[in-house]
């Protein structure tokens, strides 16, 4: 339920940032000369908010709901599931602060700096443990196809994140 609510919140925030940067294309002075409100700083924030904050929360919410219903059981390790919620919100908050400040790797859809990437990895591994643990403790024999797709998505995103976000740290908030 928490992920569903935050999906709506982050969706609205992401779309509002999109409206701001779209308006800046017509009226560049809308950044008011403030560096962290420029198009170049807000565009990565918009894409990350819509994809990872809105989309990520929606996928967490639906996968957690579906796996419980189709496996006829509660989530495996509920406290770890709660950690995935708060950890993911922390990732989003860290991105919302660091991107406008210009802390970025400059890689499309992998802009976040290495400390945030590590937090993403920890949250994602926790998510995999909760999801696959729930499938493993199911009360029915077969696994619904939706769970195969969610499982594939979890593995694919993990691989994509590891490969696309691989970086060499050059400082606390800088990597190459």
State each model region's role.
Residues 134-142:
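Inter-helical turn/loop segments and adjacent helix faces that build the functional surface
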Residues 1, 109-110:
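Glycine- and acidic
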Residues 175-176:
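Long, highly hydrophobic alpha-helical transmembrane signal-anchor segments
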Residues 2-103, 114-135, 147-172:
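Hydrophobic cores of alpha-helical transmembrane segments in multi-pass integral membrane proteins
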Residues 103-109:
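Inter-heme linker and motif-flanking segments adjacent to c-type heme-binding CXXCH motifs
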């Amino acid at each position: 339920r928490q992920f569903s609510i935050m999906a709506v919140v982050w969706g609205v925030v992401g779309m509002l940032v999109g409206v701001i940067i779209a308006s800046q294309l017509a009226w560049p002075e809308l950044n008011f000369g403030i560096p962290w409100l420029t198009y170049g700083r807000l565009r990565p924030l918009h894409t990350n908010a819509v994809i990872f904050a809105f989309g990520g929360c929606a996928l967490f919410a639906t996968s957690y709901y579906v796996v419980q219903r189709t496996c006829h059981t509660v989530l495996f390790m509920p406290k770890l599931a709660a950690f995935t919620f708060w950890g993911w919100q922390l990732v989003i908050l860290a991105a919302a602060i660091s991107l406008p400040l210009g802390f970025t790797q400059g890689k499309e859809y992998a802009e976040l700096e290495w400390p945030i990437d590590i937090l993403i990895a920890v949250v994602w591994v926790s998510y995999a443990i909760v999801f696959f643990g729930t499938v493993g403790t199911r009360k029915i024999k077969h696994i619904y196809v939706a769970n195969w797709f969610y499982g594939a998505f979890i593995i694919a995103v993990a691989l994509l994140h590891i490969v696309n976000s691989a970086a060499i740290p050059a400082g606390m908030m800088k990597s190459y």
